[in-house]
Swiss-Prot record:
GO terms for cellular component: cytoplasm. This is tRNA 5-methylaminomethyl-2-thiouridine biosynthesis bifunctional protein MnmC. GO terms for biological process: methylation; tRNA wobble uridine modification. The gene is mnmC. It comes from Pseudomonas fluorescens (strain Pf0-1). Catalyzes the last two steps in the biosynthesis of 5-methylaminomethyl-2-thiouridine (mnm(5)s(2)U) at the wobble position (U34) in tRNA. Catalyzes the FAD-dependent demodification of cmnm(5)s(2)U34 to nm(5)s(2)U34, followed by the transfer of a methyl group from S-adenosyl-L-methionine to nm(5)s(2)U34, to form mnm(5)s(2)U34. It catalyses: 5-aminomethyl-2-thiouridine(34) in tRNA + S-adenosyl-L-methionine = 5-methylaminomethyl-2-thiouridine(34) in tRNA + S-adenosyl-L-homocysteine + H(+). Transmembrane segments: none annotated. GO terms for molecular function: flavin adenine dinucleotide binding; oxidoreductase activity, acting on the CH-NH group of donors; tRNA (5-methylaminomethyl-2-thiouridylate)(34)-methyltransferase activity.
Amino acid sequence: MKPVMPHAQLDWDDQGRPRSRVFDDVYFSDQSGLDETRYVFLEQNRLAERFAALSAGGRLVIGETGFGTGLNFLCAWQLFEQHAVAGARLHFVSVEKFPLSPADLQRALALWPDLKRFSDQLLKHYVAIHQGFQRIVLDNGRITLTLLIGDALEQLPQLDGQIDAWFLDGFAPAKNPEMWTAELFAELARLAAPGSTISTFTSTGWVRRLLNAAGFKMKRTPGIGHKWEILRGEFLGWPEGVAPPAAAKPWFARPTRLTGDRRALVIGAGLAGCATAASLAARGWQVSLLERHDAVAQEASGNPQGVLYLKLSAHGTALSQLIVSGFGYTRRVLETLQRGTDWDDCGVLQLAFNEKERERQAQLASAFPEDLLQWLDQPEAQARAGVGLAHGGLYYPEGGWVHPPALCQAQSAQPGVTLLPHQEAVELRKVGDQWQAFDGERLIATAPVVVLAGAAEIKRFAQSGELPLKRIRGQITRLAQTAQSQALATVVCAEGYVAPARWGEHTLGASFDFSSDDLTPTTAEHLGNLAMLEEISTDLVARLHVSERDAESLQGRAAFRCTSPDYLPMVGPLADREAFTRIYAALSKDARQVPDMPCPWLDGLYVNSGHGSRGLITAPLSGELLAAWLDNEPLPLPRSVAEACHPNRFALRRLIRGK
């Protein structure tokens, strides 16, 4: 049976207020939802004074069960703006099984004109909200909202972070008992920071007792409106006699957070480097972005058009989860760029060009909801594309194309990022607590933190030389549009892809060459790209007058993709390879034992590389992931996915498997 995106099913009363059909309960008080939110959640957690106490560079993390209409989040944001100093940040993490559709959210939030300035920003970025972790960055990075879409007991155990204040705001315990269980409260305790506070609108005795048993000290306090009493409390610590949650494996544990000088060098100004620089700068870091060329996006990130295409698995793999979360994040980032020139959400159609592909697509169509992907038969696909097609396929309505240099330029132009062109680092040395980057014997930059984001070129550094990255040459072809080719309405993919024209040119590609190191475009690969276009649409070939074009004069460009053996990127802190092998040598004899030894981190050295042909999907969110590792923030991905992307995974496999 085709899954349906579990959007909230709502009824609306005569005053325009939403009510859940599933739980037969209201989203907020019939009297004054704003007053109740401010009293129950903001006042009981003492947020006004805690926001005021934050220093520049400080942050407070709020966790919530039940995002609903976002009312609590918006009220917290409004209060934060009123009391927090410039440079302080608010991070809000909320789990929601049944998210409102964008239209319903807009309708619900229209009830609160007092919050319009904040709700307008949320609504602008409330796009591509799909299952799993979905990060939304607001107010130029001052506000971070991480939505965990799905069942709370599936999503919260994957969250890695520390929560300073909890809002318990699911539907009433009698209506939705699954949100008020000992198992869930144990997750709240696991995630609670020392001294974390908690509040909820209910005063039910068994809820209070379960929270107390989880390590919170709860007490009843006078309520508001028709609520006679409510609960508030604080986290005292993991209860005695209960086994504490297992710590992260040392090779995946968080490095000690660096204090003091918040300067970073990012080496490489492609998609990964620019995303990393932007994410760090949003957190108050001063970032020097080193680039060997004269501008950003001059290598693999320099193609005129790249495709926002989700190559998914029906089996919920780490890569598939990363792609869904990364796709959503990239789509939201693109909302700040110019549609039509920098990007376009024209949709992406993946043709079922053979039986194997058709079977794969059938599995995906049964595993994912229609707002993410939908099966179109041949007539429907042809109508959607605007050109003749021989096959149906999967349509991704939120997909499209992106001009990668525009994204890189926007991210590198963020306050706090300084681009240093014509600077090619070839060696790193650690002196005291500073990393030094050299281009030979000349020192070009120093900082306590370095992020290697130069694709496979990072193998030139001794500290990262054994990372198993490989280069794959790819070439794209540019074709001037014709009056007839303007009919192409969406990106169409088979073995290759073709995009609707940008600035009068279609982009098609891309070749895969595993052996060549020469980046000079070749006629043979242009002809190969034209052959892939023929497989996509003979009608489009005719519309583009391909037979009349001189193959020798075709224009395009070639670059190297950078990929890893498991096709996941490498994002996170780097360890000393020799020390790692020595400390964890016992794993080669028994992989089940975990030596009680801290990982030998190369303090301050990180990597963001290996994005392959998925950089538009994975690199922007990987910038957030890297910044979260560095600043000890809640991770923007499930812990298991972050570990699957960790650079240490390869050293670990070599120890365990002997290869």
